[in-house]
Amino acid sequence: MDDISATTIQTNHQDLVNDVTYDFYGRRMVSCSADQRVKVYDFNDDTETWAITSEWRAGDASLMRVAWAHPSFGQVLAVCSLDRGVRIYEEQKKNFESKTWVEVAKLMDARSAVLDISFCPFQHGCKLAAVSADATLRIYEAMEPGNLTYWTLMNEIALMPSPPSRNEQPAFCVNWCPSRWREQYIAVGCMNDAYIYKQNSHGKWKKVAELPGHTDLIRDICWAPSMGSSYYLIATACKDGNVRIFKVETLCEEVFQEEEDAGNSMTEDSNFNLNSLKVELIGEYDNHKCQVWRCRFNVTGTILSSSGDDGCVRLWKASYANLFKCISVVSLEKKPEKL
């Protein structure tokens, strides 16, 4: 693998940066912080640097996550906050020479802090999943993608019998399966547990699998792009210091079809049970030796990045039989290590 170079970007945030993410093309970047501000950066080809082009206050409390919508819907951002809100921003023309970000919608259905958000693949419409500390997953949809002012709350899913107590630290995360052509799946981290939900033909979401083995709070969860493979990969970042990678395979489609055809004579939950998917833990790595906070796959699903309290970003590459190996460690304190 080629040597990895690290560049420091001066965000000028006044508090912890809770999230950073690229847009679809990797030419723009956005950060959100506990200082309640969102900052958008554009890449300059001439200087090969990132420059802040827009910034604004996006809530009344710490901002937890920010997400780009697919560019087919325009330049659109969603931001979630500890103030229980999810805000939608759209970049609009201010005049002939400049643009500005405008808040076009505010979703305030949560009864507690919203901790994570995820847009679905654009082929399934303009949908947004939001999970909050009240142990509830909410699915929103902009029925008219050309008008992002109006969002409909399509589903409200209780992840636990009751929310965590005030003495417990809440930990919830969500990630939409990036597959464009298959069924719609959502992976959810719920305290020490992780689940996969599937949408049926009636638009209802049901739990179809569990990702086992976690012994502490799950901080992040993500799907790998399938790239035409017959299975999925899901990674989790956990407070117990482990990065875990799961292989998920669907059962025979004919069985699902038979169950769907017989749906009128079956109960609502009968098509969806914890045997609908085959889940296998194929990797468990404790290289961080401390709490792991984030994990993400690259666009081909062959390299996984993880970051933890050790101040390092570790890159994991898939080898034969989906065995992942740490190939590089990136740290701001020293030159990136090639392993």
UniProtKB/Swiss-Prot annotation:
Write down a Pfam family by its short name.
WD40
Instruction: Give one GO molecular function term.
Output: structural molecule activity
- UniProt xrefs under InterPro entries: Sec13/Seh1_fam (IPR037363), WD40/YVTN_repeat-like_dom_sf (IPR015943), WD40_repeat_dom_sf (IPR036322), WD40_rpt (IPR001680)
Could you give the subunit structure recorded for this chain?
Component of the nuclear pore complex (NPC). NPC constitutes the exclusive means of nucleocytoplasmic transport. NPCs allow the passive diffusion of ions and small molecules and the active, nuclear transport receptor-mediated bidirectional transport of macromolecules such as proteins, RNAs, ribonucleoparticles (RNPs), and ribosomal subunits across the nuclear envelope. Due to its 8-fold rotational symmetry, all subunits are present with 8 copies or multiples thereof. Component of the npc107-120 complex which consists of nup85, nup107, nup120, nup131, nup132 and seh1.
Write the protein's name. Answer: Nucleoporin seh1
Alphabetized UniProt keyword annotations: Cytoplasm, mRNA transport, Nuclear pore complex, Nucleus, Protein transport, Repeat, Translocation, Transport, WD repeat
Q: Name one GO biological process term.
A: protein transport
Q: Which GO terms describe its cellular component?
A: cytosol; GATOR2 complex; nuclear periphery; nuclear pore; nuclear pore outer ring; nucleus; Seh1-associated complex; vacuolar membrane
Species: Schizosaccharomyces pombe (strain 972 / ATCC 24843)
